[in-house]
């Protein structure tokens, strides 16, 4: 694809005014194609996943970091322009025509104690795609080359898009649980991230139990190999060695902790969670049960997950929408009408 002229325009969606989806917070606009900085790539977007974090940004669950931001941080596209300093800035060379991925994390300082010890996801100066900077609900976007991702082969653009956040954050969440080999893992909520994480855990020999509100999601869980699937607040049939809470519902923390066996760990995968009810120490935490949060991801997480995905083909269920229906896609996600991980095609 030829790089667009500096005066070229594109179609995109912006968060006009954060609020519930039925108030029309998204607005479709025609705006200038962004220009890449010397350390950036200009990318023609081919597919962009529709993530629950996009919903949190759009509905105002998260504070506004950029007025009228273009959401979207699970971006797959084609490099059409390479900044003059990219060779020095990137961990690997990028050329025009390369397929590239753009994820949530797009900037860290590189010098703080967190960056130096390999925990760049905790960097106080971190910046995020589709929140601090414009994302992929558009025909074109930019990304710092140092935070662009080479992608595994064997996947379509649509299949790859959810791997860039739903996949990576699920992979990190699974690591945070310290699930023992052959252990029993509970998944609370079964949307885009959980249905990918389940396959990762199954490939590692885990036994999966799913608690989720949607009948279609429960059906998908069983099709993918879960040992059981029940309603969101139901108790699994066996004690769990670990659990991951994907649903942004604080009320589920207590039943998840109660389902843990001694020494079990509950990882909370989301960036936003409603209030957690009062805990009872003896009932919910004693016997060395733990709660752990999960904050973003590192580039090392992404590389490890993509290596895993290249070896174990993940079956990504991707209801597809055209770019012009981004508002409908987010509305369907909000209403629980999506099984799997929705993707916008551009």
UniProtKB/Swiss-Prot annotation:
Signal peptide residue numbers: none
UniProt modified residues of type N-acetylvaline: 2
Binding site for Zn(2+) 2: 109, 112, 115, 123
Keyword entries, A-Z: Acetylation, Metal-binding, NAD, Oxidoreductase, Zinc
CDD domains the UniProt entry points to: CAD2
Binding locations of Zn(2+) 1: 51, 73, 165
Top EC group: oxidoreductase
Free-text comment on the cofactor: Binds 2 Zn(2+) ions per subunit.
Note: Was identified as a high-confidence drug target.
Protein name: Probable alcohol dehydrogenase AdhA
GO molecular function: alcohol dehydrogenase (NAD+) activity; oxidoreductase activity, acting on the CH-OH group of donors, NAD or NADP as acceptor; zinc ion binding
Reactions accelerated catalytically: a primary alcohol + NAD(+) = an aldehyde + NADH + H(+); a secondary alcohol + NAD(+) = a ketone + NADH + H(+)
Cofactors: Zn(2+)
Keyword Oxidoreductase: yes
Cysteine disulfide links: none
Family according to the record: Belongs to the zinc-containing alcohol dehydrogenase family.
Gene that encodes it: adhA
Enzyme nomenclature, EC number: 1.1.1.1
PANTHER family noted in UniProt: ALCOHOL DEHYDROGENASE 1-RELATED, VACUOLAR PROTEIN SORTING-ASSOCIATED PROTEIN 11
């Amino acid at each position: 694809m030829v790089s667009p002229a500096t005066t070229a325009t594109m179609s995109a969606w912006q968060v006009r005014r954060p609020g519930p989806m039925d108030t029309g917070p998204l607005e479709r606009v025609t705006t200038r194609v962004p220009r890449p900085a010397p350390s950036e790539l200009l990318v023609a977007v081919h597919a962009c996943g529709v993530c629950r974090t996009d919903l949190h940004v759009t509905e105002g669950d998260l504070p506004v970091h950029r007025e009228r931001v273009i959401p979207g941080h699970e971006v797959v596209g084609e490099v059409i322009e390479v900044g003059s300093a990219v060779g020095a800035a990137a961990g690997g060379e990028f050329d025009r025509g390369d397929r590239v991925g753009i994820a949530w994390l797009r900037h860290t300082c590189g010098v703080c104690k967190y960056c130096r010890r390999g925990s760049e996801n905790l960097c106080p100066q971190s910046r995020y795609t589709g929140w601090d900077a414009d994302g992929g609900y558009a025909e074109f976007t930019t990304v710092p080359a140092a935070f662009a991702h080479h992608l595994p082969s064997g996947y379509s653009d649509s299949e790859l898009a959810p791997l860039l956040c739903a996949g990576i954050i699920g992979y990190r969440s699974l690591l945070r649980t310290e699930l023992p080999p052959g252990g029993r893992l509970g998944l609370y909520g079964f949307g885009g991230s959980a249905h990918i994480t389940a396959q990762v855990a199954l490939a590692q020999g885990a036994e999966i139990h799913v608690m989720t509100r949607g009948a279609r999601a429960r059906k998908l869980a069983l099709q993918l190999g879960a040992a059981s699937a029940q309603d969101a607040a139901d108790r699994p049939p066996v004690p769990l060695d670990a659990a991951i809470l994907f649903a942004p519902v604080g009320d589920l923390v207590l039943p998840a902790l109660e389902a843990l066996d001694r020494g079990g760990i509950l990882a909370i995968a989301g960036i936003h969670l409603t209030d957690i009810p009062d805990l009872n120490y003896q009932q919910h935490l004693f016997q060395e049960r733990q709660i752990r949060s999960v904050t973003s991801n590192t580039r090392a997480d992404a590389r490890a997950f993509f290596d895993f995905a290249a070896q174990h083909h993940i079956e990504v269920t991707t209801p597809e929408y055209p770019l012009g229906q981004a508002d409908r896609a987010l509305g369907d996600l909000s209403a629980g009408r999506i099984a799997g991980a929705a993707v916008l095609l551009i």
